[in-house]
Amino acid sequence: MVEFTVPEVDYTRYTNRQLAAVPLAVLAVALLVIGGWYVATGAPVNPGVDFTGGTELRIATDAPQSEVAAAFDSQPESIRSVAADGTYVVTFQSGSATSTELQTQAEDAGFEVRSIDAVSANFGGETQLLALGGLAVAFAGMSVLVFAMFRSFVPSIAVVLSAFSDIVIPVALMNLFGIELSLGTVAALLMLIGYSVDSDILLNNHVLRRSGDFYESTARAMRTGVTMTLTSIAAMIVMTIMATLFGIQLLAAIGTVLVFGLTADLMNTYMLNVTLLRWYKFEGVTR
């Protein structure tokens, strides 16, 4: 049986500025990507059919992708091949055509329509407001709870800043990798709030509330926290691969966003959060 051990990091070799520079630089780049995307497209991240409205067809055919696109009067928004069962998932934006018209065009071309899902533009807009509102409320509630737990500004802001970065970085990567904002990716962002707070509170509790010096407490927290996060990343990678092979776009998107966020969480927790806690323990408390 293979044994996994988390290597200890000698934090004494690095200054607070050196440790904080990398996560803050990555956060700044992520914010620039999101800001640039907003200027270019009018939205910080591309919304999917769940929020803009549209129609999604799953068709079975041996035809090439170009022939699938040519079978419809309206230009498809996207065409994804599902190799596992020989189907295509064809997506149309709202207003392109009715679901009945698209189904008729697909059948006239000799394609077998396995399933068809349609979302109206009005319903999609309302769903987007509810989903993003829920994300904002969840983040605000998490922030209030963290401040109530620690009742000290620096440890609390360390957790909140790490959680904020854990959400912003995946959103920027969603833009770069062409992943649209959907109900699935919003759910993944909500899960990231929980993952982030979990590892950050674990670190804060070991450093602030348990015996031992700062570096011993940090090492103990890392043994548990890093193992937990790497296990989650491995599970999400497997889920993403399997979901992609079988054409389950929702699970593939959730898994990809979670891998982005959990990887960012390792950096933010054990570089940025550790930096703020070390400053608080050795400099902030004495002031």
From Swiss-Prot:
It is found in: Cell membrane. GO terms for cellular component: plasma membrane. The keyword Magnesium does not apply. Pfam families: Sec_GG (PF07549), SecD_SecF_C (PF02355). Keywords: Cell membrane, Membrane, Protein transport, Translocation, Transmembrane, Transmembrane helix, Transport. The chain crosses the membrane at residues 19-39, 130-150, 153-173, 177-197, 226-248, 252-274. Residues 40-129, 174-176, 249-251 are extracellular. It comes from the Archaea. One of its GO terms (biological process) is protein targeting. Residues 1-18, 151-152, 198-225, 275-287 are cytoplasmic. It is a multi-pass membrane protein. Coiled coil: none annotated. Its main location: membrane. Disruption phenotype: A double secD and secF deletion grows very poorly on solid medium at 45 degrees Celsius, confers a severe cold-sensitive growth phenotype (30 degrees Celsius), as well as having defects in Sec-dependent protein translocation. Has no effects on Sec-independent Tat substrate protein export. Involved in protein export. Part of the protein translocation apparatus. Forms complexes with SecD. HAMAP family: SecF_A (MF_01464_A). Belongs to the SecD/SecF family. SecF subfamily. This is Protein-export membrane protein SecF. It comes from Haloferax volcanii (strain ATCC 29605 / DSM 3757 / JCM 8879 / NBRC 14742 / NCIMB 2012 / VKM B-1768 / DS2) (Halobacterium volcanii). The gene is secF.
